[in-house]
């Protein structure tokens, strides 16, 4: 099961709603994944289509409990290439679909023409809990969240630009920074930062999934920190090795051209130690001197040796 499906299944296990909260959930689900159909004799029907059976069962329960609508769940094969099962909840004229659509703020009637409303009515999101439940419904109807092992991305797919903007504004009342982009014929409200994805999961009540994501975030951060440390250590080691090789080349050049005995005693001591201990750090070389010398002192002497070697190279010796 994908992480997105796990989140939706977790959220659907909660079904203790007040009627106002149930209206908010249904309103958002129906706008995200519902279709209005005109039947014969000026009758209408409404279908909610989902690939997640838990969502279909939740809709069935809410309709039965709060609206006394006894509908059915039909299962059929999707028209997509994957041929997944899809679940269809149909609400007909005889079941009271018109009253339901008005109650949840999905339908509007202009000049006798019945159309879907893409506003988010204030009476549907009148308090904090109903706002959270609306966002939950929008996620169940058209949302998805990426596998946090790979990336942090949560989105809501809508089919109307104004509705996408309204949903974005509602989400952002919780201090989030969701944005809208157009993707082919859809308008997508999305969040990309890990911390904000966590916040939104908290808003919709997906607490177990939230903890799973947080654990993944912690592990990923630890891995990144370890990788940074390893890269830093590797870079430092490479730098030390390159410096040691360069210093040894300079010392051998001096030894060949004029002999180490021509060097001042303090430089000669460091030169011999570097030849004998090519892998040691400057700090360790300094400890071997008598009296001991600090890292900067050893570095200063080796720089003098390299300068002498450079002069010999210029002279062509």
Swiss-Prot record:
<dbReference type="Pfam" id="PF02650">
    <property type="entry name" value="HTH_WhiA"/>
</dbReference>
<dbReference type="GO" id="GO:0003677">
    <property type="term" value="F:DNA binding"/>
</dbReference>
<dbReference type="InterPro" id="IPR027434">
    <property type="entry name" value="Homing_endonucl"/>
</dbReference>
<keyword id="KW-0132">Cell division</keyword>
<comment type="similarity">
    <text>Belongs to the WhiA family.</text>
</comment>
<dbReference type="Pfam" id="PF14527">
    <property type="entry name" value="LAGLIDADG_WhiA"/>
</dbReference>
<dbReference type="Pfam" id="PF10298">
    <property type="entry name" value="WhiA_N"/>
</dbReference>
<dbReference type="GO" id="GO:0043937">
    <property type="term" value="P:regulation of sporulation"/>
</dbReference>
<protein>
    <recommendedName>
        <fullName>Probable cell division protein WhiA</fullName>
    </recommendedName>
</protein>
<keyword id="KW-0131">Cell cycle</keyword>
<dbReference type="InterPro" id="IPR018478">
    <property type="entry name" value="Sporu_reg_WhiA_N_dom"/>
</dbReference>
<dbReference type="InterPro" id="IPR023054">
    <property type="entry name" value="Sporulation_regulator_WhiA_C"/>
</dbReference>
<dbReference type="InterPro" id="IPR039518">
    <property type="entry name" value="WhiA_LAGLIDADG_dom"/>
</dbReference>
<dbReference type="GO" id="GO:0051301">
    <property type="term" value="P:cell division"/>
</dbReference>
<comment type="function">
    <text>Involved in cell division and chromosome segregation.</text>
</comment>
<keyword id="KW-0238">DNA-binding</keyword>
<feature type="DNA-binding region" description="H-T-H motif">
    <location>
        <begin position="281"/>
        <end position="314"/>
    </location>
</feature>
<dbReference type="GO" id="GO:0004519">
    <property type="term" value="F:endonuclease activity"/>
</dbReference>
<dbReference type="InterPro" id="IPR003802">
    <property type="entry name" value="Sporulation_regulator_WhiA"/>
</dbReference>
<dbReference type="InterPro" id="IPR004042">
    <property type="entry name" value="Intein_endonuc_central"/>
</dbReference>
């Amino acid at each position: 099961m994908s992480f997105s499906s796990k989140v939706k299944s977790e959220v659907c296990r909660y079904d203790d709603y007040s009627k106002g909260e149930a209206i908010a959930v249904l309103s958002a689900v129906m706008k995200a994944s519902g279709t209005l159909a005109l039947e014969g004799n000026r009758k209408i029907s409404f279908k909610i289509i989902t690939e997640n059976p838990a969502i279909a069962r939740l809709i069935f329960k809410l309709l039965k409990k709060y609206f006394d609508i006894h509908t059915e769940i039909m299962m059929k094969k999707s028209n997509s290439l994957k041929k997944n099962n899809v679940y269809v909840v149909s609400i007909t004229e005889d079941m009271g679909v018109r009253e339901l659509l008005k109650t949840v703020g999905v339908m509007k009637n202009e000049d006798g023409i019945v159309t879907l409303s893409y506003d988010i009515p204030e009476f549907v999101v009148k308090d904090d809990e109903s706002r959270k439940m609306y966002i939950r419904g929008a996620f169940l109807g058209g949302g998805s969240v990426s596998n946090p092992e790979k990336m942090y991305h949560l989105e809501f797919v809508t089919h109307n630009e104004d509705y996408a903007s309204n949903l974005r504004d509602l989400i952002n009342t919780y201090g989030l920074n969701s944005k809208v982009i157009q993707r082919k014929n859809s308008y997508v409200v999305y969040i990309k930062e890990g911390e904000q994805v966590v916040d939104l999961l908290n808003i919709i009540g997906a607490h177990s999934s939230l903890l799973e994501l947080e654990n993944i975030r912690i592990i990923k951060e630890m891995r990144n920190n370890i990788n940074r440390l390893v890269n830093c250590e590797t870079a430092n080691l490479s730098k030390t090795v390159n410096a040691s090789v360069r210093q040894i080349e300079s010392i051998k050049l001096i030894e060949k051209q004029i002999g180490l005995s021509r060097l001042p005693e303090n430089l000669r001591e460091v030169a011999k130690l570097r030849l004998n201990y090519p892998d040691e750090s400057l700090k360790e070389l300094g400890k071997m001197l008598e009296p001991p010398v600090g890292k900067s002192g050893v570095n200063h002497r080796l720089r003098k040796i390299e300068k002498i070697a450079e002069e010999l190279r210029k002279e062509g010796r």
